Amino acid sequence: MALAYTDVQVEVREISLQNRPEKLYEVSKKGTVPVLITTGGLVIDESLEIMLWTLKNNLDQTWLIENHNKEIEIINKNDILFKKWLDRYKYHVRYPENSKEYYRENCSNILSDYENQLSNTKYLLRDSISIVDIAIFPFVRQFANVDYQWFDDNYNKLTSWLAEISSSNLFIQIMKKYGLWNDNNKIKV
């Protein structure tokens, strides 16, 4: 979303994570997505780093606050703690040592913080959208999609926040589907 927000032109290469192309590993040893290669050849293979690079290298930095340590701290907590529990909640059959409800409860401990924050501000950090919202949104969306009714029943403010971002023109713009990339594909910008 940060790339689209700042109108950075990119070549999109949609891949199957079950059949990752060798070119992905040639560019990034991690073999994970997303990966951004700048026109200067810099390889960035972390979502947050891509967002920060995009926002810092464009004139419009309204998604950032002056000292963005707090933003980074919130995003890192989400990426480290919430993502761990989210994966176990979504794929609970792969983690039979605990119940689906156990994993949901661990996610809920973090979601409750977000819900409480939304009692004070329109978005997760302030009254205007920020990089925190954009970084955390996909994970909250994944959580909600496991059992939307339960999510909706328990998180009124997060449900509204999620609906607002999901219905934004920016989100709709980036969610268009692409065919799987191969060497013969034309570039999609």
Annotate the PLM regions:
Residues 177-189:
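Long, charge-rich low-complexity segments
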Residues 74-167:
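GST-like fold's C-terminal all-alpha helical module
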Residues 1-106:
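GST-like domain detector, emphasizing the conserved glutathione-binding G-site
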Residues 61, 148, 183-184:
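A short hydrophobic/aromatic micro-motif that marks alpha-helical segments and, especially, helix-coil
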Residues 14-15, 174-180:
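Acidic carboxylate-rich catalytic motifs and surrounding loops in phosphoryl-/glycosyl-chemistry enzymes
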